[in-house]
Amino acid sequence: MLRPVGKQRVAEEIIDQLRGLILKGSFAPGDKLPAERRLAEELGVNRASLREAIKSLEQMGLVKTRQGDGTRVLDFMQTAGVELVSHHIPTGGKPNLEVLRDVLEFRRFYGREVARQAAIKGDDEDVRRLEEVADRAADPAIDAEALMKVDFEFYVELTRVGRNRVFQLLINTIRSAVLNYSAFFVTFNPPAAVVRKNQRDIIKAIEMQDGERAAQIADAHLRKGADQVLSVFKGQPSA
């Protein structure tokens, strides 16, 4: 289950291994990690590096160390923060359908609400900046992966326009979670013309300060994309 780590980035590698095992359920909530000496031997590291890694895992809300009891795994769904999302998603191989569904559901909710807020709070300068992003999507030479990233950045810019600090910090945190699935999203990208129309229609709604219209456009666009992706994996076992 555990494997020796390399000499470089020792603490980071320990964190990666233990975090991965906790997220996969190899260590369940309430389980006690092996004793420090044994765990250090299995990983092939010194105890100082192991302590550093355990401290980081505690800060993430994954484990809790108590004197006389050792280090126990916590229920991360109750104790961890949203920054854990990007680590909960595989960067290669088959996606976990449950996590993919959650990411797409969040993306739809997030896109709808930031479009609404952007229309309510946006000004002429915001419209100009959104148009600059939309112009990149209009490049006839743009490839599918670049188009997907530009479309995501359009929604990041909408978040800035909406001026909600929580949304801005949240999207900074989950950006890698979304982009880790880029290989799957690219496959189901709508045609460039559809992406451009969606972006232009949202910009027009912002110019008209029509929050409901902006939200409806974003929701329809993101719902269709999510349905296409999930329809392919429906009925297949998760990773």
Where are these regions (language model features)?
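Short linear motifs at protein or domain termini
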Residues: M1-Y110, R116, K234-Q236
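Juxtamembrane/interface motifs at transmembrane-helix termini
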Residues: G6, R51, G93, L147-D151, ...
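Short, 15-30-residue, compositionally biased linear elements
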Residues: V10-A11, N189-K197
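Conserved amphipathic alpha-helical segments that form helical-bundle/coiled-coil interaction surfaces
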Residues: V103-F184, V195-K204, R213-D227
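Short, charge-rich amphipathic alpha-helical segments embedded
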Residues: R223-P237
